[in-house]
Amino acid sequence: MSNSGSLASLTNDFERFKRELPRDFPSHVRDTYRINLAARYLGRPLPHPIGKGSGQLSLNSGQLETDAEAGLAFAVLKTVIAQDAAGDQSMAAWAIHESKMKVERRGAGWTVTWKGRGWDRSFDEYLALVRTGWDLTRDGQLLTVPSVKYHLPRLEEPFRDAEYVFTTDALAKAWGESPLLLEKDFSPTLAGDQLSDEKAQILRWLREVPQRIRAHADVRLSMKLMNARFDDDFQHEMMEAASGADALVVFNRLFDATAGVAYGGQELSDRNLRVLDRPSARRPIGPSLSGTGNIHSGRMIVDYALRGCSSVQLHTFFQLPLEEYPATGGSRTQRALHALIFDPRDGLLAVMLEREAAGTLARRGGELHFLDLIGGN
């Protein structure tokens, strides 16, 4: 099929799938457009690059099952706060109930703000959610990844290893297969906390946390890096310090110290892409990257891919008012995927075909490959 023919088919599919997006849309895309959307996160193959970041949209089995049915590639579970065998949590200040999330416009885009932090239910309930996630992962329906906030000491203090031992071991047993896939969260509220006032303290965490987690289980580890309250150069120092991880999620939301809330929108993507644009952020070896921040279109997915990200994590775009999605049927996850993939102007397929026409993305074996975008700008 010619490039112009593909664009015509894309317009037809965009209209046709407004009512219902087929769950196995990556196969349809490959058959119809000869475009391979395969992506990767934490070394695991994905049918396409779009996943859901940790938060209020991944804290119960119903949400995970809806996402699996929609064809989402992966979901990171709500962040649990580590504890020791007695149930003590050094980071207990983060295990508080979330207030209602507020979805609002910010500039030309959208953001979600709320005052709340991590998992506020029992640890046993979290382990049950991990087991549900493992069932979906094992059956190939939805890759799920638990998320943890472990103890982070001040510079002169030791790590509370008892929390690392108990929490990691319990998660590994609930996961049921080696290696345990795990995301370590460095949250926006942490960035706004006094704990994060010192650069040396942050860099120590990033250097030492991976080995402390892996000391207690076979773990494939991703670290979700915060946007620290320092300059772009320090974001690069953080990436370098975190090189012991298997993957990095770049970068968590910004923190408004005055309002006491985290936020996203264009300010977030502008900073993230600017930091990732630097040559020092693109190393041929080291942790793989997963992009996050203001991802509201396939074009933005490509922007992150061109800067080295082999997958992306969204949160806000799955929460828009229903009338903001072009689709008229399906769950919010389905409607979001429909827009991100099939929008004939800014969807992922349209942008890949656009780059093919411009000579900046070539076919291999007759196909365009999403992963060929990585680091390609």
What are these regions (language model features)?
Residues 52, 75, 248, 279, ...:
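Conserved, mostly hydrophobic/aromatic
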Residues 54-57, 149-151, 225-230, 286-300:
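Glycine-rich beta-to-alpha transition loops that act as phosphate-gripper elements at the mouths
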Residues 100-106, 119-141, 198-221, 261-288, ...:
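Alpha-helix-loop-beta-strand connector modules within alpha/beta enzyme cores
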